[in-house]
Amino acid sequence: ARSIENMERLINKHPSNPFYNELLGEIYFANNDYKSATFYHEAAINNIDKVNDLYYMMMGNYLLTFEETNKSTEAILNLKKSLLINSENAYAWYLLSRAYAQTGSISLANYATAERYFLIGERELSYEFAVKALKQIEENSPEWYRSNDLIEILQKEVSKR
C-alpha cells in the first residue's frame, strides 16, 4: 500500500514521466488488480517519447489476464504493434498465440506458435505449427505467406532428421 502511495505521489509530481505509470501498473499487476494495471500502463504508453515494443507487449500481457474476448482482441492489437517494432521477441509471439486462442482464432494461434518456435530454435515444432496454420489460415494473408515461408525454410532442415 505504501509503494502505491509513493508512486501516486511521483505521478502527480511528474505526470508525463511514463516510467512511474509503468511501475505503478506493474505493482497493481503483481497484486492482481488488472484493471488498475492496464489503466496505468496505458498512461505510460501515452507518455512515451519513442515507440517501445516492450510497453506494447506488457499491455498485451495485462489484457490477456481478463480472459474476455474484447480484451483479448485489444491484446492482439498491442502485441502486433510490439512485433512490428521487434519481430524477434519470442515471448511476444507466445502471448499473441494465447490471445488468438482466446478469441477462437486457432489457425492464427498456430501461426504465432510457429514463429515463436522458429525464434527459439525448435525447428521441427515450428514446421509442424506452420503446416497446421496453413490448413485453415486465410489465403493470401500476411500470415499465410509467412507460414509458407517458414515451411519452405524448414522443410529441408526437418527432412534431414
Predicted segments with their positions:
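Extracytoplasmic and endomembrane cell-envelope/extracellular-matrix remodeling and assembly machinery
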Residues: 1-47, 149, 159-161
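Terminal, low-structured helical/coil segments at or just beyond the last alpha-helical repeat
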Residues: 117-161
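Solvent-exposed, acidic/flexible segments
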Residues: 13-18, 30, 34, 72, ...
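Zymogen propeptides/activation segments of proteases
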Residues: 2, 74, 110-112, 125, ...
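Alpha-helical adaptor scaffolds
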Residues: 25-32, 39-103, 107, 111, ...
